[in-house]
Amino acid sequence: MMVPVRCFTCGTVVGEHWGEFKERAREGDEDPAEVLDELGVERACCRRMLVSHKDLVDIVSPYQ
């Protein structure tokens, strides 16, 4: 669905990193771990918020 704004576990703001993470890591240009390191996302709970996010808007929207 929508990109999470805050980490579910610790509450740190992670939404601000989504755009750059998606551009650099999701398209296969760079290793996701290196991108997160460069963005300053250090905690494992915050990293999983970005790595595991799946945008389902296109799949869910026909049912609304």
UniProtKB/Swiss-Prot annotation:
CC cofactor: Zn(2+)
Protein keywords: Cytoplasm, DNA-directed RNA polymerase, Metal-binding, Nucleotidyltransferase, Transcription, Transferase, Zinc
EC number: 2.7.7.6
Binding site for Zn(2+): 7, 10, 45-46
A Pfam family recorded for this sequence: RNA_pol_N
GO molecular function: DNA binding; DNA-directed RNA polymerase activity; zinc ion binding
Cofactor note: Binds 1 zinc ion.
A biological process from GO: DNA-templated transcription
Protein localization: Cytoplasm
Signal peptide location: none
InterPro entries linked to this entry: RNA_pol_su_RPB10 (IPR023580), RNA_pol_suN_Zn-BS (IPR020789), RPABC5/Rpb10 (IPR000268)
Source superkingdom: Archaea
Reaction(s) catalysed (UniProt annotation): RNA(n) + a ribonucleoside 5'-triphosphate = RNA(n+1) + diphosphate
Keyword Cytoplasm: yes
Gene Ontology cellular component annotations, sorted alphabetically: cytoplasm; DNA-directed RNA polymerase complex
SUPFAM superfamilies: RNA polymerase subunit RPB10 (SSF46924)
Subunit structure: Part of the RNA polymerase complex.
The family this protein is said to belong to: Belongs to the archaeal Rpo10/eukaryotic RPB10 RNA polymerase subunit family.
Function: DNA-dependent RNA polymerase (RNAP) catalyzes the transcription of DNA into RNA using the four ribonucleoside triphosphates as substrates.
Name listed for the protein in its UniProt record: DNA-directed RNA polymerase subunit Rpo10
UniProt organism field: Natronomonas pharaonis (strain ATCC 35678 / DSM 2160 / CIP 103997 / JCM 8858 / NBRC 14720 / NCIMB 2260 / Gabara)
Organism lineage: Archaea, Methanobacteriati, Methanobacteriota, Stenosarchaea group, Halobacteria
